[in-house]
Amino acid sequence: MNKFKFFIVFLILSLVFLQNEYAFGSSLNEELSYYSVEYDNAKTFKESIKQKNIELTYKIPELHTAQIKTSKSKLNSLIKSNKNVKFVNPTCSTCVVEKSVKTGKNLNNKKNGSHDLFDRQWDMRKITNEGKSYKLSPDRKKAKVALVDSGVNSSHTDLKSINKIVNEVPKNGFRGSENDESGNKNFEEDKLNHGTLVAGQIGANGNLKGVNPGVEMNVYRVFGSKKSEMLWVSKGIIDAANDDNDVINVSLGNYLIKDNQNKKKLRDDEKVDYDALQKAINYAQKKGSIVVAAVGNDGINVKKVKEINKKRNLNSKTSKKVYDSPANLNNVMTVGSIDDNDYISEFSNYGNNFIDLMTIGGSYKLLDKYGKDAWLEKGYMQKQSVLSTSSNGRYIYQSGTSLAAPKVSGALALEIDKYQLKDQPETAIELFKKKGIEKEKYMDKKHYGNGKLDVYKLLKE
């Protein structure tokens, strides 16, 4: 009998051991994924993930939001055992969505004066009334413009007013796939040649002229050479606001999914990323900053469910909603693009109650019509694309809504200085809409918002 009892006990213990061994082994073999988490208490959250041996990969303390890397089993355990965790979803990433064309031409204008390049800046000549707005600029420029973007070439001869650079990209970059990303907070390299393009439209002051030449610019780098986490963008906005920037330019984004009918903690949408972005924008507004965002470059009506849902492979019957973010969020000045004839660019997103205003971002209509060779040889590129500063220290033609938004950001900084509207974002926006926008008869609300940017009109008293 005793032998039988001993055998039973031995068998039970063996089964328990085997179950634990199996569970441990499966945990080791489980795929690790990245998740965005919203929590209540920072200390409790930190202790919880430490206890469960979950890796913390990114955090935004101001928003009570973080990114973790873990297995599904550990994630489920964290959610079930921790009331401090509010919501969790797979982390959403973003990418720069400009249509990039290899022109084979980089302009190196060392031999030419600024007048020669300004002649080629048909877009800047239009919105400044042939440069007349420069003469109306305030003598002392105190306003600061932040760029949440891919970095910048601060040694470019036309971008001497770059003051501060904050690298938001963590060590090893996007999900550990970029070994050349050190995580150094001062690292500035613009590997995508995007932030440098944007900076030129705001404050270039040399051979090329931005809308607000010489304005102080601060750059919050949220891209390496690949994608960016949307949480990095939110962190960039938070840091820009904390640094007392008057305007924060965001010429990037993604189509974020949010299901307002879903009340579950573990989400299959992107609520945490969406909410973090909205909270970051609200935070910036309370700090006195104006967030300016470019619309997407897909030429779709964002208010048509079928069109925008297609961007994320969703059918129109789902309760999930897709948002062009951050352009479609609250407390954002949303900017679309027009071409050389002041008509909406073919790539610029639109929709009812979506756009605040338009300005020039260029077009590729003639490229699509005649092909690349004719586009380059017959001067169509110079006619329709926007000339800006390049990360290689030269200049390059490009088109996209990303080149429209910074014109508005630079103009807002001019207005803030001119009319002494520091830390008055709502007043500044209201005045801007009254003085800085011109509306042609054909400009309907759905495609053009309130109209097109006029910097000369904005500054003329």
Swiss-Prot record:
The active site is at residues 149, 194, 402. One of its GO terms (biological process) is proteolysis. It is an enzyme of class 3 (hydrolase). GO terms for molecular function: serine-type endopeptidase activity. Pfam families: Peptidase_S8, PPI. Residues 1-23 form the signal peptide. Residues 121-459 form the Peptidase S8 domain. Pathway: Antibiotic biosynthesis; epidermin biosynthesis. Keywords: Hydrolase, Plasmid, Protease, Serine protease, Signal, Zymogen. Its EC number is 3.4.21.-. It comes from the Bacteria. The keyword Signal applies. Protease which cleaves the matured lantibiotic from the modified prepeptide. Belongs to the peptidase S8 family. This is Epidermin leader peptide-processing serine protease EpiP.
